[in-house]
UniProtKB/Swiss-Prot annotation:
It is a peripheral membrane protein. Substrate binds at residues 71, 116-120, 178, 183, 243-244. Keywords: Cell membrane, Flavoprotein, FMN, Membrane, Oxidoreductase, Pyrimidine biosynthesis. It is found in: Cell membrane. Pfam families: DHO_dh. This is Dihydroorotate dehydrogenase (quinone). It comes from Nitratiruptor sp. (strain SB155-2).
Length: 351
């Protein structure tokens, strides 16, 4: 059965139920190596032109699944088999939490967008750590996206991040500090220079595992550049730009809560990424996410300084076929422009 047929069935359900159905299927598939092998043969693009060594691991292609899809590390192996060069799990919090009241996930099919107000629902660090112990070390890179519990006051947030770094640094190829989700009250207030300086200075003392910062698109370009520069100066190994947006003017019929993602945030996300890349390209690893839905868009981000890319919403609408077509399309763009390896194209438009 092709993905369009599967999607028609899944889209009969509300988005969160559909996600749980997919999660159950993906989790089941992960226990059967022959299924994973078949999926890999069909969807996973492994080409020397796209392969990169980063963070001490080989990324067979630059496209990863963004955090929020595999919140609990239940689908990690299957997502790699479906074509992703790496998988970022989470967001994980120290204690389990159920997230915000339902309904909290909404599709906007004609606009190929999603709005979510999930609120870091996850099984908690202990359970997710045990799952990762069963699948690591993996043959592909795994990132862990970490966030504070909703009940943790901002002035104690540092302790949550300390605990999470100590818990996951040996089970991940990189860690991501999430202070940019709009769905935990007060979390975005931590996107300030003094907290970021303190956080990354602490991280540097705790681990050699690369720790990255993920930022929101809802700030000025100057502010984004300043925050990211502060993080890199304090020891951040990279920047992920961007998270979902709370600019509801981008989406027709938007709710007045939660974060918007998909095609509608493409230009907003790209503008912030471009500003950060102009300042930090060559100084740190830059990962672009937000509205990437084609090889053409992926290539634009790469030419503007992205070493790696992530998708989420476009995967919901396009399925694993999209992952494959983006990676194969990137190879074609590289060849057309006379490049023999992705590294030659990264940042070519801003050098």
């Amino acid at each position: 059965m092709d993905y369009e047929s599967i999607k028609k069935i899944l889209f009969h359900f509300d988005p969160e139920t559909a996600h749980h159905i997919a999660e159950s299927a993906f989790e089941l598939a992960s226990f059967f190596p022959f299924i994973l092998n078949r999926l890999q043969e069909k969807f996973l693009v492994k080409d020397p032109m796209l392969s990169q060594e980063l963070f001490g691991k080989t990324f067979c292609n630059p496209l990863g699944i963004a955090a929020g899809f595999d919140k609990n590390a239940t689908m990690t192996k299957t997502l790699h088999a479906l074509g992703f060069g790496y998988v970022e799990i989470g967001t994980v919090t120290p204690k389990p939490q159920s997230g915000n009241p339902k309904p909290r996930l909404f599709r906007y099919i004609k606009q190929e967008a999603i709005q979510n107000a999930m609120g870091f629902n996850n099984d908690g660090a202990e359970v997710i750590k045990a799952r990762l112990q069963r699948i690591t070390p993996a043959s592909f890179p795994i990132g862990v996206n970490i966030g504070k519990n909703k009940t943790t006051p901002d002035e104690q947030a540092l302790q949550d991040y300390r605990f999470l770094i100590k818990t996951f640094h040996s089970l991940s190829d990189y860690l991501v500090i999430n202070i940019s989700s709009p769905n935990t009250p007060g979390l975005r207030d931590l996107q300030n220079e003094s907290f970021i300086k303190e956080l990354f200075s602490m991280a540097k003392e705790l681990t050699n595992t690369p720790v990255l910062l993920k930022i929101a698109p809802d700030m000025s370009e100057d502010q984004a550049v300043s925050l990211c520069s502060t993080a890199v100066d304090a020891g951040a190994a990279g920047v992920i730009a961007t998270n979902t947006s709370i600019d509801y003017s981008l989406l027709r019929g938007a709710k007045d809560f939660g974060g918007v993602s998909g095609k509608v945030i493409k230009e907003k996300s790209f503008a912030i990424f471009k500003a950060v890349a102009k300042e930090l390209f060559g100084k740190t690893v830059l990962i672009s996410v937000g509205g990437i839905d084609s090889a053409e868009e992926a290539y634009r981000r790469i030419r503007h300084g992205a070493t790696l890319l992530q998708i989420y919403t476009s995967f919901i609408y396009g399925g694993p076929g999209l992952v494959k077509s983006i990676n194969e399309g990137l190879i074609e763009y590289l060849k057309k422009d006379g490049f023999t390896h992705i590294s030659e194209a990264i940042g070519i438009d801003i050098r």
